[in-house]
Every structure is written in structure tokens, then in C-alpha cells.
């Protein structure tokens, strides 16, 4: 009973957080600014995505991540980092397509969810990308395939564990494999120059190291810089 009450308490608190984020996002969007969320837990940006989906029906999401995050719940928690995109795709009809890149830790039910989505979820699994590279495909070609799957208006959701584990050793769930920093930069540059418009973004799951270890924060800050640049470049501001 205590466990069920605790789960219900956390789920209710999570919904309040989403409401707070949505309200803050509304104020930012009303000013004409580009909204961004810096998590914590990858569930953090749900409120922002919800607000954007109301204003930009038909939008797409580019998810860079080690995990699919398509579980219907995780140990009873409906709003955990493992369920963010299940919640997005089942609750937000304004999101036309989810394009996942770098996925390499995924459950059978998540694969079934992708297969049942009728193309609404497009997953570029990390190993499949590498297999194509080993067969001779360039990273530019792969990036263009990824971007081609996105609609005109794009939200970028970046979980730091989408990178190789040496770049984010303190994140909560690092996974072998992943994208190199220059590969991410190239993907974001091509996205910005593709004619698509970045309408917002998030960066989540960056975890600090020891007080004298700035590596994780340094990598996270550089990713944030690139995300902001991608959004501005897509709008011809820079």
C-alpha cells in the first residue's frame, strides 16, 4: 500500500511539473523566443512539447538518445524518463512524427510500439547506422536520410547518453556505442540548412562529476551551444 501511495504521489507531482513547464513555455513563446528545457530527467520537457504541439500541429521530433523511451510506464511510474516519448506519441496528436537516432538499448514492447506506429515513429538504430557506414555509406548520406524523415517544423530532444559513453560517463544510464561529438554537430548543421525550422529543444540527463571533474558539464555545455546555434541557424538569424 505504501508503495502504491508513493507511486501515485510521484505521478501526481510529475503532472504538476508538466503544467508548470507548459505555462512557462507559453510565456516564452508569446514573447517570440525559442524555448528550451534543461533537464534532469528526460521526462522534463513534456510540458514544452505539449505546448508546441498545440501551436505547431504537424511538428516532428528529432530524438538523439541511447534509449527509445517508449515504455508505457517504468516500475509503475507513468512519467519517468523511460516513458517520455510513449506519452508524447499517445497523448499529443499534434506531433506528426518522432525520428529517433542512436538507439541501442530498447525493449521488445518498444520495438512493437515502433512497428505498430505505421511510420509515425521512425527509428535509426545505432548498430544499423554503423552497419551502413561499414558498407560504405557516408555520415552525410545517413544524416540526410534522418532529416528527410522529419516534417518542416522540428523539435530537437537531446539525451546526453545518445553520445558515446566516454563523453558522458556520469550520466545515469550510459550505453556502449553512440554518436561522436562531430557526428552530432554535422547532423545539427545539416538539419539547420535543410529548410526546416527548429521550434524548440531540450538537453537532458547531463550529470556532474566530482568537484574537480568538469568533463561532463563541459560536454553538456558544448552540446547546448550547438543546439542553440542550430535553432538560430534554422531561422536564418546566424
List each model region and its residues.
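Conserved alpha-helical scaffold segments that buttress catalytic/binding sites
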Residues: 1-238
Amino acid at each position: 500500500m505504501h508503495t502504491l501511495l508513493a507511486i501515485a504521489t510521484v505521478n501526481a507531482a510529475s503532472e504538476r511539473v508538466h503544467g508548470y513547464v507548459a505555462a512557462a513555455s507559453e510565456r516564452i513563446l508569446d514573447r517570440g523566443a525559442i524555448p528550451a528545457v534543461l533537464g534532469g530527467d528526460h521526462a522534463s520537457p513534456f510540458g514544452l512539447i505539449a505546448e508546441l504541439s498545440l501551436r505547431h500541429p504537424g511538428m516532428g521530433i528529432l530524438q538523439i538518445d541511447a534509449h527509445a523511451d517508449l515504455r508505457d510506464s517504468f516500475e509503475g511510474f507513468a512519467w519517468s524518463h523511460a516513458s517520455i516519448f510513449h506519452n508524447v506519441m499517445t497523448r499529443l496528436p499534434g506531433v506528426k512524427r518522432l525520428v529517433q537516432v542512436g538507439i541501442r538499448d530498447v525493449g521488445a514492447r518498444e520495438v512493437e510500439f515502433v512497428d505498430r506506429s505505421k511510420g509515425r515513429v521512425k527509428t535509426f538504430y545505432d548498430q544499423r547506422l554503423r552497419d551502413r557506414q561499414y558498407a560504405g555509406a557516408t555520415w552525410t548520406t545517413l544524416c540526410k536520410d534522418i532529416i528527410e524523415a522529419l516534417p518542416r517544423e522540428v523539435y530537437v530532444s537531446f539525451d546526453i547518453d545518445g553520445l558515446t559513453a566516454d563523453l558522458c560517463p556520469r550520466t545515469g544510464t550510459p550505453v556502449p556505442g553512440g554518436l561522436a561529438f562531430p557526428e552530432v554537430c554535422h547532423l545539427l548543421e545539416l538539419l539547420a540548412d535543410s529548410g526546416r525550422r527548429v521550434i524548440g529543444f531540450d538537453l537532458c540527463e547531463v550529470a556532474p562529476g566530482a568537484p574537480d571533474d568538469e568533463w561532463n558539464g563541459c560536454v553538456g555545455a558544448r552540446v547546448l551551444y550547438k543546439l542553440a546555434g542550430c535553432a538560430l541557424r534554422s531561422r536564418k538569424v546566424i
